[in-house]
């Protein structure tokens, strides 16, 4: 006799943009859950329904169900008369904060960067919205211990204890591409991100004044006023050792990691921080700020900027490169081992264990 169905809805609307962290998180989680869906139905009677953009109906196969939504319908879907045992809201910024007919609404919190990026009335508005979302959630998960501590220090999360489930990282070691169109020689320092101001990219650009024998390659969105300001500084200082690139493919990204000398990530606000771990998967040294979640994610095998003075940062890079490349084989293997502890398979397994725990209540 078939087990009674236990219905779990998972919000995956942001798979429409895999070039940002939320899109990649939702795509990888959805893929891993779909891969296990048939077994979970047989063993536990679980039936997944994925909430996705219409054009992604069917993209995770036939062992899961789908609800198609649009940007406009995200606010009203919470009221559809469909029962779910669990509705997993996969990040705190979505307009879908809960499902009215779900027995348990589970929300994953990725960061509260607005606490550091907003001020005045805008900050107070964001705080009220987030506090309301926390209150509506029956259970919480966080993508790092830092995020959990940060949220609990600013907001009332009682009586929910919450748990930490780390994101996975995609191993790009088997991904290959062609970067010849960029005309870049091997052995550069590398940074890739959204290039928002919080990524602190201007610091590593300014640092290059003190590393005239090194080259820096920066990849991301070059269309912002922030980047225009950085380009103006590059011209003012006459820096010829900084290259900025836009619109790289996943294959090109992997190749840019592969051919770099080191990865630099002096970010001010990170809930997790995928790019440093992507670089570590390819055996590269990473240089990180000591802020937010980066010490937690980078671990003992990362190098850290003790302060963000450009001259001191340059010294940290010089000393770190000398240390890493004094024993490159052993050092590369150590960072690979660390990165390999963050897998999407383990991430999905942790969420499944939580789903089973919530279903048993």
Give the role of each language-model region:
Residues 1-361:
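Carbohydrate transferase catalytic cores enriched for Leloir-type hexosyltransferases
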């Amino acid at each position: 006799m078939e087990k009674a169905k236990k219905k779990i809805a998972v919000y995956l609307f942001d798979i429409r943009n895999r070039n940002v962290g939320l899109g990649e998180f939702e795509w990888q989680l959805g893929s891993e859950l779909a891969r296990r869906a048939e077994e979970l139905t047989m063993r536990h009677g679980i039936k997944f329904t994925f909430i996705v953009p219409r054009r992604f109906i069917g993209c995770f196969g036939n062992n899961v169900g789908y609800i198609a939504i649009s940007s406009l319908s995200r606010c009203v879907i919470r009221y559809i008369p469909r029962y779910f045992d669990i509705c997993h809201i996969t990040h705190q910024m979505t307009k879908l904060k809960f499902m009215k007919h779900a027995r348990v609404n589970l929300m994953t919190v990725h960061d509260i960067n607005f606490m550091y990026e907003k001020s005045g009335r805008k900050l107070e508005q964001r705080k009220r919205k987030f506090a309301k979302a926390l209150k509506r959630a029956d259970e919480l998960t966080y993508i790092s211990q830092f995020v959990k501590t940060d949220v609990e220090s600013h907001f009332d999360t009682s009586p929910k204890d919450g748990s930490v489930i780390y994101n996975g990282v995609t191993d790009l070691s088997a991904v290959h591409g062609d970067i010849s169109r960029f005309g870049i020689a091997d052995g550069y320092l590398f940074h890739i991100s959204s290039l928002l101001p919080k990524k602190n990219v201007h610091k590593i650009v300014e640092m290059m004044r003190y590393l005239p024998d090194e080259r820096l390659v920066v990849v991301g969105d070059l269309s912002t006023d922030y980047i225009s300001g950085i380009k103006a500084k590059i011209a003012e200082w006459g820096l010829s050792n900084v290259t900025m690139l836009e619109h790289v493919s996943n294959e090109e990204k992997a190749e840019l990691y592969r051919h770099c000398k080191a990865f630099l990530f002096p970010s001010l606000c990170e809930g997790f921080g995928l790019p440093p771990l992507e670089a570590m998967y390819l055996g590269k040294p990473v240089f990180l700020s000591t802020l937010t979640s980066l010490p937690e994610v980078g671990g003992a095998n990362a190098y850290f900027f003790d302060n963000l003075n450009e001259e001191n940062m340059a010294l940290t890079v010089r000393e770190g490169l000398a240390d890493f490349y004094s024993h490159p084989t052993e050092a590369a293997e150590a960072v690979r081992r660390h990165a390999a502890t963050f897998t999407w398979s383990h991430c999905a397994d942790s969420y499944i264990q939580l789903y089973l725990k919530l279903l048993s209540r």
